Amino acid sequence: MDVSRVCIYLGNTHLYSPTCVLYNLFFNSNQMDTLQPISPSELIINPDGSIFHLHVKPGQLADKVILVGDPGRVPMVAAHFDTCECDVSSREFRTMTGTFRGKRISVVSTGIGCDNIDIVLNELDALANIDFATRTLRPELRRLEIVRLGTCGGLQPFTPVGTFVASEVSIGFDGLLNFYADRNRVAELPFEQAFRAHMNWHGEQCIAYPYVVHADKELLDRIAADDMVRGITVACGGFYGPQGRRLRLPLADPEANRKLEAFTYGGLHVTNFEMESSAVAGLSLMLGHKAMTCCMVIANRVAGKADAEYKNSIDKLIRLVLERI
């Protein structure tokens, strides 16, 4: 075992990595002294004691968290709650915490993209694991269960509009994890090498260095039953060019979607496009939380079909996640 990281075996076997979870919340030699207060410029706390962007206070966060992109989807999820204890909004971030069949759950909107996931995941972890009074890490670290519930574009004939897809593996085109020291500790490096070779990108073409991360196996198995298709999800840094859509601007790699459709690794196909799963899985793994993403296909790029009236049918996916989280 690599002794430079603290690794606790939690029974979570990765498909492409060592049979342990990196539960290395700030225990890495590159990371901060756990007794050293975090400065106000690094951890910004609002005057009411809430975290900077989310405006949520530590006591308002449940251990089970559902992430949605659209703030309007938060009350759609919370409508199924038996009780609701808080409803907090700030910018595109809305949080409602309540109970569903005895389970305390927070549903949080993230907005669109991995840049927003960087804000949300770091602030959720701060709420869970930093003492706001002393600005130091709590002695007992808290592990969250995080499920992103969203929409996506299908990339295979077997993922038509309406399919529920679970991201067993996510490929990040956004570059976010490349800014963190633990990037190579959580990434699936042989998978990355095989993917880069397959895409055959050179020079400045699609230059963000793709990273590959795996969902938490136990949480994936619990959420993704036989009613979901498992596969590889590509998390893009945009909706148009990065996902191969051309309106007026030409694409750097017009063949990218065809190459993605043909790529396989470890028996898995690239099933779908979205814009957040890689950051959710990667940051959660770095921070010691359990995370996975499941989405409903609302556009199939192979068939050229889309459903803009998907909001009624996504309620089935909401109920499934609430029952299984």
List the model feature ranges, each with a label:
Residues 154-159, 282-290:
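Alpha-helix C-terminal capping segments
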Residues 287-302:
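Glycine-rich phosphate/pyrophosphate-binding loops
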Residues 245, 251, 259-287:
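A C-terminal functional module that forms or caps the active site or interfaces directly
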Residues 300-325:
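His/Asp/Glu-rich mid-to-C-terminal helical/loop segments that flank catalytic regions of hydrolases
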Residues 33-211:
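Metabolite-binding pocket within alpha/beta catalytic cores that recognizes anionic/polar moieties
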Residues 192-264:
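Active-site rim beta-loop-alpha module in soluble metabolic enzymes
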Residues 10, 15-17, 25:
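Short hydrophobic targeting helices and cationic amphipathic motifs
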